[in-house]
Amino acid sequence: MESKLLYVDETECPEYFIVTGLLVNSKEDVDLAYKRFKNNIKGIRIPRDKKARLFTEFKSTLLDRDYKRVKEAMISELNKLEYCAVYSCYVKKISFPQSVKEKIYIALLMRIVMEIRVNVEIVFDTFNNSGFESDILNCMQGCPNVVSIKPGDSQKEAGIQFVDNICSILRLHKTKRDIHAFHSLIKGFVKEV
């Protein structure tokens, strides 16, 4: 059976902890979409001092706040792909320590993976915490549809950049702070589990 790629990232705000998986057919498709996206935004005026940072890593917080047109261009290019964004939320009643957050992350990721009915190769945004990353690897390798799982660097993985931005859209939508209506651009491609 053929497998698909699942890029995973998380986001958090006072009300929610959200884990999102971007399910795509191949790394090549995502990399090509990212390349087209970068070419399409070359004409957008961006101050020189922010351009290097922006073009190195299209962080969602920067795009949400200052570069609506860049974010729209990114989502437009992503929408040309065959993809599905599957996410799971934890409603926070209180803030919790990192150890609890790690357990919640794994539980939400497990929920996402169990919902997907195809084999997946998972690439999750690195945490620079080898103990936590080992816990993720150990837990997820037991899922019958997980072919492989590895951490990835958001500066090197276009899929992680895309899923980072989808995470922020979902966070803004869930908290009713999506003033630019980004969610309307992806709502046909997302599923909450």
Regions found by a protein language model. Give the residues of each.
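Phosphate-ester processing/binding pockets and catalytic centers
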Residues: M1-V193
